[in-house]
Swiss-Prot record:
Region described as Hercynylcysteine S-oxide synthase: spans on this chain: 378-874
Binding site for Fe cation: 413, 506, 510
Subcellular location: Cytoplasm; Nucleus
Use case: Ergothioneine (EGT) exhibits antioxidant, anti-inflammatory and cytoprotective properties, leading to its growing application in the pharmaceutical and cosmetic industries. Also shows UV and gamma radiation protection activities. Finally it acts as a cation chelator and a regulator of glycolytic metabolism.
Family: In the N-terminal section; belongs to the methyltransferase superfamily. EgtD family. In the C-terminal section; belongs to the EgtB family.
Region (Disordered): 631-650, 732-761
InterPro entries for this protein: CTDL_fold (IPR016187), EgtD_Methyltrsf_superfamily (IPR051128), MeTrfase_dom (IPR019257), SAM-dependent_MTases_sf (IPR029063), SAM_MeTrfase_EasF-type_put (IPR017805), SUMF_dom (IPR005532), SUMF_sf (IPR042095)
SUPFAM superfamilies referenced in this protein's UniProt entry, alphabetically: C-type lectin-like
GO biological process: methylation
One function term, GO molecular function aspect: L-histidine N(alpha)-methyltransferase activity
Protein name per Swiss-Prot or TrEMBL: Ergothioneine biosynthesis protein 1
Native species: Neurospora crassa (strain ATCC 24698 / 74-OR23-1A / CBS 708.71 / DSM 1257 / FGSC 987)
Segments of skewed composition (Low complexity): 744-758
NCBIfam families, alphabetized: methyl_EasF
Length: 876
């Protein structure tokens, strides 16, 4: 169960009306001297009556009741008593740890930092840390985040008078708190986020990682998180912590039934007919305790017969083994800095953002025009994982894709390319060995139809240099770059900055190139720094969340394409762009209709079967080890109605087909809800079969602009209180979600009624970078993610589930295009009428690229290996 200190609705829950609805924005505004900042974006409504009904009568699975029922006013009072019980080791252990180690913990938090505690309480625990910080003379701003003003006032009223520590309240949900931390005035402040009381144990394990990952994204390189985790694996000790000899815990649990009756408005549960069953369940992940209601006899509740042997789950508390804690941190993009434990049963873990964790928030991932040295270090950490851990030594000289150089080329190409650009702009001598520029400057990208046709490239040696020599050279170039940052990023001239920026984005793009090459090899090693996903579980969850793929009317609108970045500019704060991103221009795009999400693996498989196409996309494989052609598929035209449901794929096909991932082959049955990635020619045939076509470059940009407008419109409505976000999910495992499930609402599908023309005034392209929050880019997952729950939402830039997006537009020279001086052949070499523009980004695309609205990528239309998907559009 959560600790009293971490409860959010708190005493506010005692005011729940009999209807089960309580609008927390109507809390009494009590007079208080407490400094409480209202950060709520919208009034929050908790409809427990609906939750009770839906969980008591589930469509599938066992009966449950929302854990939030336990935390009305009386429940909080009872739980406060529980935290003082000898058996309840969680609070006692945490206090012992803080008493002994608070001074050491405080040493990790610098003066001038802010501390944000997720949930407020009686300060019994956090005061120990605040006192240590105050004694150290550190100026600290402490913020207690809670959804209840009354709870914040009560908490802050108990704060002792500190000399250096200032205490504040944040009134809002966890989501509100995260948005507050994302604000420009807060995002760059040093911070430490506290999540005490082992409240993380009330989440399912996958949800716990998702929750933490949300806050990881707002952490800077020097920020920290301090998280309490229950690791007790003594069954008796765990059991008695939740089943005390005095019986207070069972009284606390039974009080939930009394609260349910008040909310329902009738005596649905007769208290005397129910008892509490607590049980400890052992598993290799660390075990858990769970609590149930069980009737003492057969009884009727809300028209349902509940047998005496039936049970209704109300609460669970997961325990974490050392291995599971490490899995949790790595999945959430965190690394452990230090830990303090009480024996083997409880620990406080100090965590920092992993070097490979790329933020999806524009004010973080693009906080300066030039990537920072921290950005470079994160990039190098990722590059080194791919090249030194996943790429076997014996595979370096192989060509997983025959149209590309051997893998070893890319090890030398990345530092050589950067060194060449630095040499051009600094006028200094190249790094040694200088002859590397002859063999590593530029790779090959030949014509798929005729590989003899290829742009100018470096000579291919008879024998590549030894790996050790290449890695030494790599470190030499990295050291050279670090030297340019030695006097501060603001002192780097614009022309040298452009060379650094070009080298940075060049390396970003080649990580993806190397990875999609490695995906074609059965010798690629699984990344070990993150846990292997449970693809079966992920598939079952995706299937349960499917919604129809709706059509949206994209209104006629004028959009901006490109950015302003003069080659001879001197403003170091202006963002850089490649030659194909310039000059900026306005274009008119006619109205059309677009589906909300891209084509999935399942839809593509149905297309193959119905059209009797044997050729699989290169992203798939046959499990019977048949050879897979590396050629291109025959184009297929035709029309097929876009049905919301189709016949099920035959088991014989599913059993023999898999999708390629860095984790090896994943059975197609586990990846049906993923976006398919294939060549343009392959997907164009599928789009025609589905009753549409692939959008043009301008139409795709128009989709992104309109998707942004819809988001802003929805956010404006939230500000006005028209929509209802959920409350803090730390309160319960199943009763309350962090983010409410999607439902067709303001984003009305075109079939019924499209947003009015007046909504087009909301469309804006003044911001260069997109907020990618929730997008599967930037290595937040190392594989595509299910996308079928997004059909009722118009997905925007980078939001296609981990794939780029094809457009039907050929890459051609446009008016005003000028080749860039540093790399004149970057785009110009591909004006051959064979390449189409792609937009967005994949799961392996850095946010600086995936989120930049002006960025343009391209591939040959029949190139089968790139991670590019497509959505279907149609004319009005």
């Amino acid at each position: 169960m959560p600790s009293a200190e971490s409860m959010t609705p708190s005493s506010a829950l005692g005011q729940l009306k009999a209807t089960g609805q309580h609008v927390l924005s109507k809390l009494q505004q009590q007079t208080s001297n407490a400094d409480i900042i209202d950060i709520r974006r919208v009034a929050v409504e908790i409809n427990l009556k609906t939750e009770i009904t839906s969980m008591f009568r589930p469509k599938d699975g066992p009966r449950q009741l929302p854990t939030l029922l336990l935390y009305n006013e009386r429940g909080l009072q009872l739980f406060e008593r529980i935290t003082y019980l000898e058996e309840y080791y969680l609070t006692n252990d945490e206090i012992k740890i803080l008493t002994k180690h608070a001074t050491e913990m405080a040493s990790f938090i610098p003066s001038g930092a802010m501390i944000i505690e997720l949930g407020s309480g009686n300060l019994r625990k956090v005061n120990l840390l605040l006192e240590a910080l105050d004694n150290a003379g550190k100026a600290i701003d402490y913020y207690a985040l809670d959804l209840s003003r009354e709870e914040l006032e009560r908490t802050l009223a108990q704060v002792p008078s500190y000399k250096h520590v200032k205490c504040h309240g944040l009134l809002g949900t966890y989501d509100d708190g995260r948005d507050w931390l994302k604000a420009p005035e807060n995002i760059n402040k040093q911070k430490c986020i506290l999540h005490l009381g082992s409240s993380i144990g009330n989440f399912n394990r996958s949800d716990a990682a998702t929750f933490l990952k949300g806050f990881t994204d707002v952490l800077g390189p020097n920020d920290k998180m301090l998280i309490g985790v229950d690791a007790c694996n003594d069954p008796a000790r765990v059991y008695h912590a939740y089943n005390d000899k005095v019986g207070i815990t069972h009284e606390f649990i039974l009080n939930g039934l009394r609260n349910a009756n008040e909310i329902i408005g009738e005596t649905a549960f007769i208290e005397g007919d129910w008892r509490v069953i607590g049980e400890y369940v052992y598993d290799e992940e660390g075990g858990r305790h769970q609590a149930f209601y069980a009737p003492t006899r057969d009884t009727m509740v809300m028209g349902e017969l509940i047998r005496s042997h039936d049970r209704i789950q109300i609460e669970q508390s997961l325990k974490y083994s050392k291995e599971e804690s490490e899995r949790l941190w790595s999945t959430a993009g965190l690394e452990q800095v230090s830990e303090w434990t009480y024996g083997n049963e409880y620990g406080l873990h100090l965590l920092a953002k992993s070097r490979m964790s790329f933020s999806l928030i524009p004010s973080v991932y693009a906080r300066s025009a030039l990537p920072t040295l921290d950005d470079w270090e994160a990039l190098w950490a990722t590059w080194d994982v791919v090249t030194r851990q996943m790429l076997p030594q014996e595979e370096l000289l192989e060509k997983p894709i025959k149209l590309r150089n051997a893998c070893i080329f890319y090890l030398g190409h990345i530092p050589t390319f950067l060194d060449i650009q630095l040499t051009k702009t600094t006028k200094q001598a190249p790094s040694e060995p200088a002859h590397f520029c002859k063999i590593f400057e530029r790779g090959i990208d030949p014509d798929v139809d005729n590989p003899e046709l290829c742009h100018a490239h470096s000579e291919i040696p008879d024998e590549w240099p030894p790996v050790e020599e290449i890695l030494t050279y790599q470190e030499t170039v990295r050291s050279r770059l670090r030297g340019l940052y030695a006097h501060g990023i603001a002192n780097i001239p614009r022309n040298v900055g452009r060379a650094i920026w070009v080298g940075f984005e060049h390396e970003l793009m080649h990580i993806e190139t190397l990875l999609y090459m490695m995906l074609q090899s059965d010798k690629t090693l699984i990344p070990t720094h993150i846990p292997r996903p449970d693809f079966d579980k992920l598939a079952r969850k995706a299937e349960s969340e499917r919604v129809p793929n709706q059509w949206f009317k994209i209104p006629a609108q004028e959009i901006t394409i490109g950015l302003d970045d003069p080659e001879d500019g001197s403003d170091i704060n202006k963002h850089y762009g490649w030659d194909n991103e310039k000059p900026p221009r306005r274009v008119q795009v006619a109205a059309f209709q677009a589906q909300g999400r891209p084509i999935t693996n399942e839809e593509y498989a149905q297309y193959l079967l119905e059209k009797n196409i044997d050729k699989l996309p290169a992203s798939w494989a046959r499990l019977d080890n048949e050879n897979i052609s590396n050629g291109t598929t025959n184009s297929v035209s035709g029309h097929h109605s876009n049905r919301t449901s189709k016949q099920q794929l035959p088991s014989s096909f599913l059993e023999k087909t898999a999708v390629r991932t860095v984790y090896g082959l994943v059975p197609l049955k586990h990846a049906l809800d993923w976006p398919v990635f294939a060549s343009y020619d392959e997907l164009a045939g599928c789009a025609a079969y589905m009753g549409g076509r692939i959008p043009t470059f301008e139409e795709t940009r128009s989709i992104y602009a309109y998707a942004d407008a819809l988001k802003k419109k929805k956010e404006a409505e939230r500000q006005l209180g028209r929509t209802v976000p959920a409350v803090n999910a730390h309160l319960t495992n199943n009763g309350v979600e962090i983010t409410p499930p999607s439902s067709p609402s303001s984003e009305t599908p075109a079939e019924s009624s499209s947003p009015s023309d007046s909504n087009t005034t909301l469309i804006t392209t003044e911001d260069l970078f997109s907020d990618l929050d929730g997008a599967n880019v930037g290595f937040h997952n190392w594989h595509p993610m299910p996308i079928t729950s997004k059909g009722n939402t118009l997905v925007g830039q980078g939001e296609l589930g981990g794939v780029w997006e094809w457009t039907s537009s050929v890459l051609r020279k446009w008016e005003g295009f000028e080749p860039m001086e540093l790399y004149p052949g970057y785009t110009a070499d591909f004006f051959d009428e064979k390449h189409n523009i792609v937009l967005g980004g994949s799961w392996a695309t850095h946010p600086r690229i995936a989120g930049r609205k002006s960025f343009v990528n391209w591939y040959q239309r029949n190139y089968p290996y790139a991670w590019v998907g497509a959505r279907v559009v149609r004319d009005l």
